[in-house]
């Protein structure tokens, strides 16, 4: 069977840069799944993506599906014919479905009986016939949140489509995809190379596009070139380029023929906080900032043009002219904002609504101030500094700089606080109050910042849950999931002695009578414990380990983490499996009994040596582990409890629990309850699989 290279390219108008990679990867995954489901053998599936095209190249694609034998069993012979040997309606209906008559059917005989059988040789369909529908189906499944319609057509896609090319080897596959008839013509760069190129074979792609069309269709090659050229350009001026992955991806998705150039701006702008300058360069202009070896921003930036100009200086000058007014704005805002103290912005917070039922940003500031001070007292931070940080926490939102460059909130508060002579940990806290902003982000660096960050997030959680507006589905307008996980990360990773229950109660109390949800505390705790589940699953913990700890509903995050590590270690012990099974057995026995158990085990009632031995061991371990549990040394406790494996196994082998003697039965049940209580001090081990 001959194998050929298959090429599909969809030529479009400029695709959304932030979605380009995901579109291409999804397209490749969808087509691969279609090929596999159809049984079409193939080699590597390679994807290509540029601003105006999505393409796939499939190596060694089989010319057709393999032929296959089809067998379809019909009714049993006893039901297929009546007493006179005439076919039954069931048999005739089955035969019609197979496209035959009953007398054309074969018979299948096994040791269980005899049935009608249809057997046929089905010839595999050609790849040429199957591919158009596969491509159309794969495109329809792309993750496109908002589709476009263009012209008079009813066709919808992420952007208008101009060309479609489907080549199997050197043969053009006739098809209409997204309203466009397939053709050999592909389009080159808008301003360089040949505008239209006729491609003869699939193997010519993407080289023909590179050489004649001046388009680097290989996404990874384009990205690597931008990265290497930008690093070299930065070295040429004695610096290091800030090549953040997200911006590098976005720039890669914006250009077809990357040309890296270096430009500069006036050194006077370096007096403005670098964060504001970087925000302008990266966020607005898609430029790469350049830093000196000491980490200070240089008066240069690197950008990527989409054309190879005969006069690159003209492009450089143009970009310098574009960025200068933005930097001048930042300079003006910075100088204007510093003419008054940060604290002077407090009254203006009264004019900005936080949430209609929960009041203004000034109301939120007052709550954060009080809660940050309370948290600081719990964790041993400077209470005065924490309350001061709380008071100033939202003041920078009223500054010109943050109003214009919104992503500088927090960091500008820090710079203005330093200018005003505030304590350094207060200034730093203003910047770090929003941390962690995303998974893997840094945590607040000092205790005051931790207190403020937790206070800000807990105020939002208590308030929004307090009016019954918890997240539903994908909708989370107040970013409560991120806030909850942020609080948990800070408490766990900083090992802070905070309890979610008292923390939520205090946050809710500060709202006065504004909250309408009487179950706000439990709702917030349940929500945060749910975030714990997601966090630990991402960390690689098994679901049953998480469930075992969640069953105890510990509300101190640092304590929760200690239990998780203890149970995870317990699972590695040789005794773990048997003790988990024993706990499950004990749990089931106790659940089925509705008898009132004794607070203490009556040693005089014990008869069998095995139950005496187990009871003694339980008492010894209870006394021994009491201080261990109190200090949260759960791993040590579970290692000690692993010693119970042998006496527990022996007990269940030799002793009947549910005996007729009521006093003896209750005593044995009471002993098992005491045994289970020991393990429940850490987690519900019975849930381990």
UniProtKB/Swiss-Prot annotation:
InterPro entries (alphabetical): DALR_anticod-bd, Gly-tRNA-synth_bsu, Gly-tRNA-synth_heterodimer
Catalytic activity, EC: 6.1.1.14
Catalytic reactions on record: tRNA(Gly) + glycine + ATP = glycyl-tRNA(Gly) + AMP + diphosphate
Record GO biological process: arginyl-tRNA aminoacylation; glycyl-tRNA aminoacylation
Keyword Cytoplasm part of the UniProt annotation: yes
GO molecular function: arginine-tRNA ligase activity; ATP binding; glycine-tRNA ligase activity
Coiled-coil regions listed: none
Family: Belongs to the class-II aminoacyl-tRNA synthetase family.
Record protein name field: Glycine--tRNA ligase beta subunit
């Amino acid at each position: 069977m001959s194998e050929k290279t298959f090429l599909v390219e969809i030529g479009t108008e400029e695709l959304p840069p932030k979605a380009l990679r995901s579109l291409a990867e999804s397209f490749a995954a969808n087509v691969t799944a279609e090929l596999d489901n159809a049984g079409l053998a193939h080699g590597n599936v390679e994807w290509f993506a540029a601003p105006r095209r999505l393409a796939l190249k499939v190596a060694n694609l089989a010319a057709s599906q393999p032929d296959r034998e089809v067998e379809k069993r019909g009714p049993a012979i006893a039901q297929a014919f009546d007493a006179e040997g005439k076919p039954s309606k069931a048999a005739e209906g089955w035969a019609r479905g197979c496209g035959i008559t009953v007398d054309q059917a074969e018979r299948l005989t096994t040791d269980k009986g005899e049935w009608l059988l249809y057997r046929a040789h089905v010839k595999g369909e050609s790849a040429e016939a199957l591919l158009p529908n596969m491509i159309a189906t794969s495109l329809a499944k792309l993750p496109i949140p908002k589709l476009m319609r263009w012209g008079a057509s009813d066709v919808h896609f992420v952007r208008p489509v101009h060309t479609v090319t489907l080549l199997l080897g050197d043969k053009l596959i006739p098809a209409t995809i997204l309203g466009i008839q397939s053709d050999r013509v592909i389009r080159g760069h808008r301003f360089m190379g040949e505008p239209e190129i006729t491609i003869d074979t699939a193997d010519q792609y993407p080289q023909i596009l590179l050489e004649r069309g001046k388009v680097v269709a290989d996404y990874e090659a384009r990205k690597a070139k931008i990265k290497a050229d930008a690093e070299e350009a930065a070295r040429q001026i004695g610096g290091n380029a800030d090549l953040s992955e997200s911006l590098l991806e976005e720039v890669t998705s914006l250009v077809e023929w990357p040309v890296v150039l270096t430009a500069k701006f006036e050194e006077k702008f370096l007096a403005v906080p670098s964060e504001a300058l970087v925000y302008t360069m990266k966020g607005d202009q898609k430029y790469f900032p350049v830093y000196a070896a000491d980490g200070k921003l240089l008066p240069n930036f690197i950008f990527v043009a989409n054309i190879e100009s005969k006069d690159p200086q003209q492009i450089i000058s143009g970009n310098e002219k574009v960025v200068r007014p933005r930097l001048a704005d930042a300079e003006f805002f910075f100088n204007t904002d510093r003419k008054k103290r940060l604290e002077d912005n407090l009254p203006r917070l009264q004019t900005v609504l936080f949430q209609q039922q929960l009041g203004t940003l000034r109301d939120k500031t007052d709550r954060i101030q009080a809660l940050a001070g309370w948290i600081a007292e719990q964790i041993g931070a400077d209470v005065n500094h924490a309350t001061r940080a709380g008071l100033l926490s939202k003041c920078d939102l009223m500054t010109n700089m943050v109003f214009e460059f919104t992503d500088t909130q927090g960091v500008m508060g820090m710079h203005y606080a330093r200018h005003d002579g505030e304590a350094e940990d207060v200034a730093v806290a203003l910047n770090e109050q929003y941390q962690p902003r995303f998974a893997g982000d840094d945590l607040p660096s000092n205790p005051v910042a931790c207190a403020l960050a937790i206070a800000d997030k807990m105020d939002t959680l208590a308030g929004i849950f307090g009016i019954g507006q918890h997240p539903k589905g994908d909708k989370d307008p107040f970013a409560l999931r991120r806030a909850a996980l942020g609080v948990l990360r800070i408490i766990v990773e900083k090992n802070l002695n905070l309890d979610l229950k008292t923390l939520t109660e205090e946050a809710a109390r500060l709202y006065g009578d504004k909250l309408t949800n009487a179950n706000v505390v439990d709702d917030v705790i349940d929500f945060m414990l749910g975030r714990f589940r997601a966090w630990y699953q991402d960390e690689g913990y098994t679901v049953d380990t998480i469930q075992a700890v969640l069953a105890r509903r510990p509300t101190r995050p640092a304590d929760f983490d200690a239990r998780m590590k203890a149970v995870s270690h317990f699972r590695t012990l040789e005794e773990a499996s048997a003790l988990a099974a024993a706990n499950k057995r004990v749990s089931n026995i106790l659940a089925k009994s509705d008898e009132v158990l004794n607070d203490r085990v009556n040693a005089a009632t014990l008869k069998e040596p095995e139950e005496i031995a187990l009871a003694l061991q339980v008492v010894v371990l209870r006394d021994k582990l009491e201080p261990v549990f109190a200090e949260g040394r759960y791993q040590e406790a579970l290692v000690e409890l692993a010693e119970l494996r042998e006496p527990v196994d022996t007990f269940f082998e030799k002793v009947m629990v549910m005996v007729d003697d009521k006093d003896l039965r209750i005593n044995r049940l009471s002993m098992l309850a005491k045994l289970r209580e020991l393990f429940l001090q850490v987690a519900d081990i019975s849930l381990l699989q």
